[in-house]
A protein has these predicted regions:
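Short amphipathic alpha-helix with an adjacent loop that forms part of the alpha/beta core around
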Residues: 57-62, 140-143
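Conserved redox-active cysteine motifs that mediate thiol-disulfide chemistry
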Residues: 63-65, 71-89
Length: 182
């Protein structure tokens, strides 16, 4: 949704119209979306990986690196997930030894076994984390994730560089970021 346009429309409404529950929900969605705009610092998170270890944005594997975060779920649209995973596997193969970028999968699954099965089935070899809260999880709210798959590219200092790039746009942006860091 075009949150800027919605925000302007809400601002011109009279008081009683602004008191509606739907308007409150829209304002909350706008507020969350604004917190994850390009150029803002990404929210902190701490989630468990498949081994039960706590992973944060500042974990050792991600320190001083740009970070591509992919939000996904085993229950997501299989065609979109498959296409996204294929692109991500190509990116991972190309950059897995690069010291300027890392990848992290944040699953919005609610079932641990389905999450683990999807990681194996789809051969997602980069770090994967999940809190089993689905789209209602804290991390989904913090990053204003409303659908999967989604992605966010962070700079080495934690600023949001780009959101929801796909295909060639994503590959080009990563190449640009890695080249600038070298």
């Amino acid at each position: 949704p075009d949150f800027n346009k919605i925000k302007k429309l809400i601002e011109v409404m009279t008081g009683i119209l602004q008191d509606k529950l739907y308007i409150e929900q829209l304002n909350e969605a706008i507020s969350l979306s604004e917190k994850t705009e390009t150029g803002k610092y990404a929210p902190f998170f701490s989630l468990s990986n498949i081994k039960g270890e706590k992973i944060t944005r500042s974990s050792e594997d991600f320190k001083k690196k740009n970070l591509l975060i992919n939000f996904w779920a085993s229950w997501g649209d299989s065609i979109s997930n498959h296409q996204s995973n294929t692109e991500l596997k190509e990116i991972y193969q190309k950059y897995k030894k690069n010291k300027h970028i890392a990848m992290l999968g944040i699953s919005l699954d609610i079932d641990k076994q389905e999450w683990q099965d999807a990681i194996k089935r789809d051969t997602l070899n980069w770090e994967q984390v999940c809190d089993f809260g689905g789209l209602n999880s804290e991390v989904a709210k913090q990053y204003a994730i409303k659908q999967v798959p989604s992605n966010i590219l962070l700079s080495a200092d934690g600023k949001i560089l780009a959101k929801n790039l796909k295909g060639e746009q994503l590959k080009k942006k990563i190449e640009e970021v890695v080249t600038a860091a070298e």
